[in-house]
């Protein structure tokens, strides 16, 4: 599976069969325009990634995950069937705004959906939007767990799949997210092959250094991935 980090919690996944999946894309300057310089992007937008995927995943309703500045552009470009899998609060907001432009599916922990050559499972997240979820994606024999924004919570452990090839999780320790210590602790328990820290680099005010997280796992068998933005890597 091909993976591209779009910044913050946003990713684009492409299966061997060509199915494209985008999760939590924030590809605008909406937050800075609405809330000021604390939300100035450290990573510029690359407009070529403002393309409509086959499947869009939204973990929760916060504006750096359900960004209407990005989503309005994506929905304007819809030229093929689009399915949106969204947490409850985001589901209702998006369905009201975009109506019949997509097939909207309400995802709560435990919900499973198979689309084309990908299987999606919603898992719990402990965040300030109570309807927040994470996603486990399965395709091409690869299991990816994107936790969404979350604190360390025992409910995450109860839902873990038998194998996690790539774990994607926040480390910034702000806004009801795990800090580096708790993120490393969760990583050790889940024992993925790879871990990719997210949600630390886009806004300096709400970010953190990534090296302390990597250092905490330096003696562990897991490989820490810190890919360049908008650059493809393959699992």
Task: Go through each PLM region and give its residues.
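Active-site neighborhood of phospho(di)ester-bond hydrolases with catalytic His/Asp-centered motifs
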Residues: 23-24, 53-64, 84-88, 144-150, ...
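Active-site-proximal loop/helix segments of hydrolase catalytic cores
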Residues: 126-189
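Active-site environment of divalent metal-dependent phosphoester hydrolases
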Residues: 9, 29-30, 62-66, 91-94, ...
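Pre-active-site segment of Zn-dependent metallo-hydrolases
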Residues: 18-57, 61, 69-77, 150-162
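Active-site HxH/HxHxD metal-binding segment of metal-dependent hydrolases
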Residues: 44-113
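Beta-strand-turn-beta hairpins that frame and shape the catalytic cleft
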Residues: 1, 14-21, 112-121, 138-144, ...
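Zn-dependent metallo-beta-lactamase
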Residues: 1-31, 35-43, 211-220, 228-232
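Binuclear metal-ion centers of metallo-dependent hydrolases, dominated by the metallo-beta-lactamase
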Residues: 98-113, 158-160, 184, 188-235
